[in-house]
Each structure stands twice: as C-alpha cells, then as structure tokens.
Amino acid sequence: MNRIIFCTFLQKKSEGQDYPPYPGKLGEKIYNQISKIAWKEWKLQQTKLINEEKLNMFNQNDRKKIEKYMKLFLFNNE
C-alpha cells in the first residue's frame, strides 16, 4: 500500500517516499513532507545545478551548497 502524505512542495496530497531519501533530521523531514513527484523534480534541478555550477560532490563545501539549494527548492527557505 502506498503512503499518502500532504506534500508541502506541491501543496496537495500525494504518494510519499518509500524511505528517507537523505540522512538525518532533514531526511526525516523530506520523508514526511515531500512526495515522490516533488523529490523527482528536485533531483532534476539538482543535476542542472551540479552541471551549471560545476559542483564536485566529493567537495564538502559543494555538498553544503547543494543542500542549501535543496532546502530552498523543497521548503522555500522555511
């Protein structure tokens, strides 16, 4: 059975994640508030950002930058 949540990104009920897609408290927040559809939209945006800004995910500062973008994209900087 699919888990239905109220997605804060889409502002409607939608199918939730199967598991937290990110570690820690932020991952739990995403699991509880962000739908599969919204997460897929973020993954597309993330790929664009990594390519356009030439971010290196082995670099800690670049990972922090992409996390900041993720929070802004998904939660509109709550």
UniProtKB/Swiss-Prot annotation:
UniProt cross-references to Pfam families, sorted A to Z: Iron_traffic
Molecular function, one GO term: iron ion binding
Alphabetic keyword roster: Iron
Organism whose genome encodes this protein: Buchnera aphidicola subsp. Schizaphis graminum (strain Sg)
Family, as annotated: Belongs to the Fe(2+)-trafficking protein family.
Biological role: Could be a mediator in iron transactions between iron acquisition and iron-requiring processes, such as synthesis and/or repair of Fe-S clusters in biosynthetic enzymes.
Domain of life of the organism encoding this protein: Bacteria
Subunit structure: Monomer.
GO (cellular component) term, any one: cytosol
Gene Ontology biological process terms in this record: cellular response to oxidative stress
Protein name: Probable Fe(2+)-trafficking protein
